[in-house]
Amino acid sequence: MPDRPEVADHYGTNYRDFGSDIYAQVRRAAFGEDLGQNSWLTLAQLERFVAHLDVRAGDRLLDVACGSGGPAVRVARLTGCEVVGVDLYRDAVANEQRLVDATKPRARFLQADASKPLPFVDASFDAVVCIDAINHLPDRPRVLADWARVLRPGGRLVFTDPVSITGALDSAEIAIRTSIGYFLFVPAEENRRLIDAAGFDLLTVEDTTVELAETARRRGAARDELAAELRQVEGDDAFEGRQRFFAVVAELAAQARLSRYAYVAKKRG
């Protein structure tokens, strides 16, 4: 299994420059609105997922691998709930804290490794969300069981898996798709089985693969438009590697060979 520091190198570097205007321009071009997301999440998807989470003022939501914190802050504003975000990377947490200081939402963030047991007591959250990050965590049965542990009975879970196997992949495509670090690939049917085994009732599965293909295409195109500036920040090799990454993500999703699903579940009990 690849070392997790390989992932940290990509994401740590990315978060250090995350607040710069050049990356904000890319996000605006790709998503239409800059939520501060470092995932495939669109505003329309965020609003749908918030409805599935069914959180409101007085509830506590855990955002696992929350990245820059932008979507978490938006959820806190939309719902009035308290959001607790955890992320592995120090620069991500620093960016999150700047958002909190500037906007004063009901949100707080801490650095924690989501591949290990989370630093929270049992049944301490009303909902858990994880967007486009479960695929970076090894031992999915243990991860889902830990999310169930921190959820109260009846609590909601929403997570997206952007690398569900739904077609044939060759070694070159896999190498590019995993070039940013560790990935765990499972078929959609395995996610369903693991959700049930962890103590959840699956409520719905949403196929967001078409949206993924378009978002990846737009991100690559936006970066092409800003290539000169991005090459200065990233260097030529890193820039070209990321462009190959976005191109392969778009192609595999457009051909429905690697799909993105959103899972909505409720903890039994």
Question: Can you annotate each of these PLM segments?
Answer:
Residues 1-29:
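N-terminal, positively charged/glycine-rich alpha-helical extensions of SAM-dependent methyltransferases
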Residues 39-57:
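Conserved alpha-helix/loop element of class I SAM-dependent methyltransferases that forms part
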Residues 62-64, 68-116:
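Class I SAM-dependent methyltransferase SAM/SAH-binding core
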Residues 116-127:
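A short acidic, Gly/Pro-enriched loop at the edge of an enzyme's catalytic core
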Residues 141-156:
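A short glycine-rich, Lys/Arg-flanked "PGG" loop and its adjoining helix->strand segment in the class I
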Residues 162-182:
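Short, glycine-/aromatic-enriched active-site segment of Class I SAM-dependent methyltransferases
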Residues 184-199:
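Short alpha-helix
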Residues 204-269:
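Conserved Class I S-adenosyl-L-methionine
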